[in-house]
Amino acid sequence: MEGCTKDGAAVQSSGASTAGSIFWWLKDRSLGRGICVDPARDNFRTMTSLYSSIHPADSVNLSTRTHGAVFNLEYSPDGSVLTLACEQTEVLLFDPLSSKHIKTLSEAHEDCVNNIRFLDNRMFATCSDDTTIALWDLRKLNSKACTLHGHTSWVKNIEYDKNTRLLVTSGFDGNVIIWDTNRCTEDGCPHKKFFHTRFLMRMRLTPDCSKMLISTSSGYLLILHELDLTKSLEVGSYPILRARRTASTSDMTSTSSETRPSSSPCHNSDSGPLFEKHMSRSSQREGTSPRNSLEVLTPEVPGERDRGNCITSLQLHPKGWATLLRCSSNTDDQEWTCVYEFQEGTPVRQVSPRCSLRLTHYIEEANVGRGYIKELCFSPDGRMIASPHGYGIRLLGFDSQCKELVDCLPKEAGTLQEIRSLYSHKDVVLTTKFSPTHCQIASGCLSGRVSLYQPKF
């Protein structure tokens, strides 16, 4: 009988283990994990473990001292080229593995170059304070492929929808403009104004291009759900979900435009319950958002609940799970890095939709280099964050083990864990970027130096 008891216990234990394994397998499958679904996941997990041994490896050999501050860094999708957007009209190209200089586009623009975006392994776009966007071909860098005119103020960032081959740009004129790169000529591309809002700072598309996020200097975050870039959004033509604070169920604005705070970025002259007014009946019955429905949020920022803040930097998790914000107080005496998880699902009441974002992690940043925007980024697998921190960068994780976000979501917002700090600059770091293919990080600073970081053993 004793042996039977032991055997029975062993069988029961084995059965529980098998059941547990099945549940873990189902969970991983629902999250898109597995060798067949995400073959690069294990490689990225191994790569992430190497970042604890990362050190400053080299500084790129700059052939010119006329480029000024480095505002943006961008790797080509295959990791073979590192591009620099510089203060003094220049774009610099390097081989990130050898640190060798490839080319300097000395007159890429007529003013500061703000952002670079690769469309594929050979084509990339740049934007500038000269109000233009330029397209370039790596095989022919002696001249621009074409120049795009349409903005009336500084152009600050570029996004690209690979499915439709539409280029999306935003600027301080408050406009988001769509460019059809399928019909580009030397004279430019057909374009249209897609959206307009006041106080626009940054615009991003989620990896699947189902949402557009727009940050503002007034502390609002705008989210366009069920995104359709083929339709221009005129004032009053899109459904508006009431503005609200991310961690609260209370509305931040009235349902009437006459009582909306003056700093609200939304433009709408109609009164009445906006969500009910513009949402289609079919969408109300099904509990789904209509195409291009606009949600206006006031993200919760630690320590800034009673003070306004400016959302200066905006990034998206590579798997679309979360958004990453860099916020500064209106008095410019505090800076925070915050992570907000996307909350999907049908709201309990359509007339009072659930907030799409929830604050999960945060950390206070060094308050140096006031007035300059610091561009932070996710690692390729989304396990880590590289954030400018004074004269260096910090590598941050959701926990000390660098687990994926979905595996360590707290019930209440917690602090990001510092994995490593790297200081190799002599001036304030403004931008940082992970290589998409190699265990390497690049950072650029206000005085124009670019540092590369790699593991050393």
From Swiss-Prot:
Keyword set, alphabetical order: Repeat, Ubl conjugation pathway, WD repeat
Lineage of origin: Eukaryota, Metazoa, Chordata, Craniata, Vertebrata
Any GO BP annotation: protein ubiquitination
Name the source's superkingdom: Eukaryota
GO CC, sorted alphabetically, is: Cul4-RING E3 ubiquitin ligase complex
Whether Cell membrane counts among this entry's keywords is no
Q: In which pathway does it act?
A: Protein modification; protein ubiquitination
Repeat (WD) residue spans along the chain: 65-104, 108-146, 150-189, 195-234, 306-346, 368-406, 424-457
The name of this protein is: DDB1- and CUL4-associated factor 10
Q: Which organism is it from?
A: Xenopus laevis
